[in-house]
């Protein structure tokens, strides 16, 4: 028995040694495999500044898209390039961008070791910016339970009221964090394409943070303006929050001029303006200005009409006669619109401004003219004290500055009648007096009356032209100013929709919460003609 046990022990040692050898071999192979499987060209982590740059490039709404058609600034008159009908389906929501923002926050915390950093401050603003814009499209949204990935794939919907309250809180936190970073002279910001890396007039990282703080508070005032129809709801504190900003400029700095705008700047090498010299032959005659925009300018004898449009020479007036600047009703059928444009009876895009190069004009996301009009509107509505006329005037003056309109002689340039090729222009000298312009009964501020409010809203609408996404449409939806034109060309039986439907995949990925949200808001019908909460209807 003892001999047998000794043999068994020998066998056990042999097997144990063999097993250890195999384990060591496998361990060695695994280590080598891990080493070989790591791609040295693939980063293990993405720096927060690269994530920020990615997010910032995703937030502009560029001109010549559907948004400016739906805001009735421009029209398509040729079927190949689409039409002027309003949407009939769902919105595109930016939850993917929001997830990138969350990743940026985590990476910034990992690399800086602090929850207070430029990326965290901008993340709060960007979240508010995106959630507000998404809610303006559809209504209620997943927010407080969103962005948790697999931890919660079916988040509940926050009411639109909750979305706005949470967004206003994010903006407050962003302002506070930015103030602290500025006070500590933080210079760690990178990847900011709008201020720190701006093509013309780039700012230092610290100066960029100061610009961003102004943007945050100016956007906050826009958010409050969107709540005008529900401003009496005490939970929103609309008047108080507006007053807080305007009464404490050191705590809540706001935009002070066009140079403070949050805007997208174009360049010829890449990121060209959508209408440019390369596509002159494709669409210059197949796109025209909308009556809601250019006819308003013409009626006011506003020189911006000659800066943005070509004269309608088929009408028989002089090139610099305001009667030559006529847009099409957005409700007109395409065939009729195309014939009118072809016969020179509609104003096309100004060739010199939009097709002579590749950089036309910057695209605002949060602009100084709008800010001025927002403050004027708040004063007119009695939310805050102040001089509405002064802010109204500043808004108009800044708009003329943007378009290069000055007191005295102005040069306006159009394509020459019978032009033989690109660049064949004719220029005129046209006098302009801001004092005379502002003295017109339709422009001179009527005071804090309904007429005065309509004047503010009209000029604010003009300031949204070809920028600021759907803000022109949202203002019409909120106030009815200006009057939008409808017909067969706008679709939807001549009715302008009030919202977008939710993305169709919500019905399959989050059905219970989706159905509950649609039921509570719209009686179970995800209808584009239904009014959302903030419209107060």
Task: Tell me the role of every PLM-derived stretch.
Residues 1-38:
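Bacterial Sec-dependent N-terminal signal peptides
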Residues 72-126, 130-408, 446-451, 459:
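Structured, solvent-exposed acidic/aromatic patches
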Residues 29-80, 85-86, 92-95, 103, ...:
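Membrane-proximal, proline-rich intrinsically disordered regions
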């Amino acid at each position: 028995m003892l001999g047998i046990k000794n043999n068994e022990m020998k066998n056990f040692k042999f097997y144990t040694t063999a097993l250890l050898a195999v384990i060591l071999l496998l361990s060695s192979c695994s280590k080598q495999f891990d080493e070989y499987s790591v791609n040295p060209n693939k980063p293990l982590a993405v720096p927060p500044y690269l994530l920020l740059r990615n997010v910032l490039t995703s937030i502009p709404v560029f001109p010549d898209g559907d948004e400016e058609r739906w805001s009735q600034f421009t029209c398509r008159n040729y079927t190949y390039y689409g039409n002027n009908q309003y949407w009939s389906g769902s919105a595109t929501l930016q939850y993917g961008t929001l997830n990138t923002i969350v990743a940026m926050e985590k990476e910034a915390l990992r690399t800086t070791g602090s929850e207070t950093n430029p990326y965290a401050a901008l993340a709060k603003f960007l979240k508010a910016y995106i959630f507000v814009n998404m809610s303006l499209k559809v209504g209620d949204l997943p927010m407080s339970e969103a962005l948790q990935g697999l931890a919660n794939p079916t988040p509940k919907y926050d009411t639109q009221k909750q979305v706005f309250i949470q967004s206003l809180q994010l903006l407050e936190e962003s302002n506070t964090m930015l103030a602290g970073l500025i006070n500590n002279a933080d210079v760690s910001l990178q990847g900011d394409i709008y201020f720190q890396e701006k093509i013309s007039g780039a700012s230092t990282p610290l100066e960029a943070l100061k610009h961003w703080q102004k943007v945050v508070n100016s956007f906050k005032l826009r958010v409050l303006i969107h709540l005008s129809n529900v401003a009496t709801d005490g939970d929103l504190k609309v008047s108080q929050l507006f007053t807080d900003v305007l009464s404490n400029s050191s705590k809540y700095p706001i935009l002070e001029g066009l140079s403070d705008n949050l805007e997208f700047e174009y360049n010829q090498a890449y990121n060209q303006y959508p209408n440019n010299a390369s596509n002159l032959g494709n669409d210059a005659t197949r796109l025209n200005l909308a009556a809601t925009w250019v006819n308003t300018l013409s009626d006011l004898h506003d020189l911006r009409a000659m800066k943005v449009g070509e004269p309608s020479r088929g009408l028989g007036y002089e090139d610099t006669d305001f009667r030559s600047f006529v847009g099409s009703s957005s409700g007109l059928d395409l065939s009729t619109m195309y014939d009118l444009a072809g016969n020179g009876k509609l104003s096309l895009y100004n060739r010199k401004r939009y097709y002579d190069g590749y950089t036309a004009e910057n695209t605002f996301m949060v602009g100084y003219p709008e800010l001025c009009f927002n403050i004027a509107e708040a004063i007119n509505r009695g939310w805050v004290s102040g001089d509405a006329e002064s802010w109204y005037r500043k808004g108009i003056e800044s708009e003329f500055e943007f378009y290069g309109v000055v007191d005295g002689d102005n040069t306006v340039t159009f394509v020459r009648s019978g032009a033989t090729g690109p660049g064949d222009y004719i220029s005129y000298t046209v006098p302009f007096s801001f004092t005379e312009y502002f003295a017109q009964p339709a422009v001179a501020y009527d005071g804090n009356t309904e007429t005065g409010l309509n004047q503010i809203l009209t000029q604010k609408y003009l300031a949204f032209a070809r920028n600021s996404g759907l803000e022109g449409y949202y203002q019409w939806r909120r106030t009815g100013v200006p009057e939008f034109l409808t017909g067969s060309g706008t679709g939807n039986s001549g009715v302008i929709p009030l919202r977008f439907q939710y993305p169709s995949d919500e019905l399959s990925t989050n059905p219970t919460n989706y159905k509950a949200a649609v039921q509570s808001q719209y009686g179970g019908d995800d209808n584009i003609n239904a009014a959302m909460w903030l419209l107060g209807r």
